[in-house]
Swiss-Prot record:
Compartments, record wording: Virion membrane; Host apical cell membrane
Lipid-modified sites (S-palmitoyl cysteine): 50
Function: Forms a proton-selective ion channel that is necessary for the efficient release of the viral genome during virus entry. After attaching to the cell surface, the virion enters the cell by endocytosis. Acidification of the endosome triggers M2 ion channel activity.
One BP term from GO: protein complex oligomerization
Topological domains annotated Intravirion: 44-97
Record comment: activity regulation: The M2 protein from most influenza A strains is inhibited by amantadine and rimantadine, resulting in viral uncoating incapacity. Emergence of amantadine-resistant variants is usually rapid.
Protein name: Matrix protein 2
Recorded topology in the membrane: Single-pass type III membrane protein
Note: When the channel is activated, one or more imidazole moieties of His-37 probably become bi-protonated.
HAMAP family per the UniProt record, alphabetical: INFV_M2
Family per similarity comment: Belongs to the influenza viruses matrix protein M2 family.
Gene: M
Length: 97
């Protein structure tokens, strides 16, 4: 039997797991790693725009715009925003007959 699977057996009152009371360190470590992985995955999906911008530019808000005319700054901001935003217009509708 695998250490990471639980076998459920019917009893008179309810379902119970055979390894639910296990104190095996490997089972405990696998459970902790699984829970941490799930939490990190959820946070990544919720905040992926912020996280990847922070990794790309560090603690700065973006590349320096010193000496760049305001019109070019605005154009650059629009390009960056459009690159990050999800475009819903690219979905394809397929009709089955």
């Amino acid at each position: 039997m695998s250490l990471l699977t639980e076998v459920e057996t019917p009893t008179r009152n309810e379902w119970e797991c055979r390894c639910s009371g296990s104190s095996d360190p490997l089972v405990v470590a696998a459970s902790i790693i699984g829970i941490l992985h799930l939490i990190l995955w959820i946070l990544d999906r919720l905040f992926f725009k912020c996280i990847y911008r922070r990794l790309k530019y560090g603690l700065k808000r973006g590349p320096s715009t010193e000496g760049v005319p305001e019109s070019m700054r605005e154009e650059y901001r629009q390009e960056q925003q459009n690159a990050v935003d999800v475009d819903d217009g690219h979905f394809v509708n397929i009709e089955l007959e």
